[in-house]
């Protein structure tokens, strides 16, 4: 019902503006709100609506956006790209200046802040890099004002703008060798809690396995099945569409309620078995495309980056480091251009 109304309103807006304006909606939170009552389980219908030009969502609120993991996408980003839809991310990135707008306990939860400048800086770097490297649009959402009213943050946003503008002349295509597949309808039939355990929680482990991945709805599998070396299927319950994929490709890794506590090392082991290049053999957030690489450390120590043969990096943001020689502190981010 929700998807149908979005398509109807989008068509109405297009007609009334004589197709001069782009039209979009906040919708498709397949990973973030897997509960069957969330009304976010007909994304494929919206992706096939010609009147919808873009879709939006915030960055996941997982674990109050703390350090040490990739703040994941709420939706299967690469299905949007495949269907010609722009993804427009709402970067409502809190800072140490963020204060509750009202004296209501709900707004005092930790999600409304990092409590210090250091964590703010690292979150801003992470949130910019995810958009730059995954090649989508975003805006900094200063929700009720004053969040970025600090010289360091304003300088960072100015620096990011320059990098983003320069990136428009570069190839930001995916180099991922892993695809994550989900059937949004599985969330409608799964037992209570299984959607969260499989589709929501697993994103945290996927994000630190040391190699990038793309994400798709299962309806797009046939079109992309020859593009990737490894497939990870998120199955809170096994639907006919997922079963069809597994029959055709029994080498998929299937994550179910029974094995959803899978570790990052187990994910790396699977990737190795499929010939996937691991940029890190230890837990790390690694975003990579054809022109940029971003590293967010999860632990203290050497970076242990393993680059494909012939690849060289030039650091363009973050405290200057020699990643081949220098031990890095945990929870810090470094952005590089690939030469």
Enumerate the language-model features and the residues they cover:
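Carbohydrate-binding surfaces of carbohydrate-active enzymes
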Residues: 7, 15, 19-20, 49-339
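Distinct, well-ordered alpha-helical segments
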Residues: 33-47
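Histidine-centered catalytic/metal-binding microenvironments
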Residues: 27-30, 141-143
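Short, solvent-exposed loop/turn segments at secondary-structure junctions
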Residues: 31-34, 64
